[in-house]
Design a protein with these regions (language model features):
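Short, solvent-exposed segments of well-ordered alpha helices
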Residues: 58-62, 124-127
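Active-site catalytic microenvironments for nucleophilic, acid-base chemistry
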Residues: 49, 73-77, 142-146
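Short, surface-exposed, polar/charged, turn-prone segments marking secondary-structure boundaries
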Residues: 7-13, 68-69, 107-109, 116
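Donor-binding/catalytic cores of nucleotide-activated saccharide
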Residues: 1-60, 88-91
Length: 171
């Protein structure tokens, strides 16, 4: 058996361009190449700047997406590589485990770990239930608002609706 060895690479990512790409996807596909503390490394001074700006390093209900979008207001460039620096996993009961079983869908009131204000702040443009694409889109929206970004009105909700229609269980 021949296993192709990929060449090691390190690429510089223009954070604003990557953010615009994810905005065009309605934030429904995940984190893309956004900077992040989840499965990534971020300088402490960048996290402190985000905390000063928003009062938290996680300015939305999904910590991974809200942190990634929040960091876009602080960081200009990020670095990605194709070599594994972190090996992540998830338990059966985690959100990732639920996604693997195609059970990553629920009423917002059933998701006990969400911040209490999540339901009250939820956008009318995002379907009102919890699943990967909806919580990511809502978290990104709130992070854009809380970092005073003028890009919040550019979120492509039609793309989000298409993702939900094709890939997600219906509520």
């Amino acid at each position: 058996v021949y296993i192709e060895r990929k060449r090691f690479f390190v690429n510089k990512v223009n954070v604003k361009n990557e953010l615009l790409k994810q905005i065009n996807y309605g934030f429904g596909y995940g984190l893309g190449n956004l900077p992040r503390v989840y499965q990534g490394f971020v300088l402490n001074r960048c996290l402190k700047k985000l905390n000063e700006k928003c009062g938290t390093s996680f300015p939305g209900p999904s910590p991974d997406m809200s942190n990634a979008v929040g960091l876009c207001s602080i960081i200009t460039n990020a670095i990605i590589t194709n070599k594994h620096l972190i090996i992540s996993g998830h338990s059966k009961k985690s959100a990732g485990g639920m996604g693997g079983r195609k059970e990553h869908v629920a009423e917002l009131s059933e998701v006990k770990w969400l911040p209490k204000e999540t339901k009250d702040l939820w956008s009318k443009k995002i379907p009102f239930y919890w699943t990967g694409p909806t919580i990511y889109s809502e978290s990104a929206r709130l992070a854009l608002i809380r970092t005073n970004s003028n890009l919040v009105d550019k979120i492509n909700y039609n793309y989000l609706y298409a993702i939900l229609n094709i890939y997600e269980k219906k509520m």
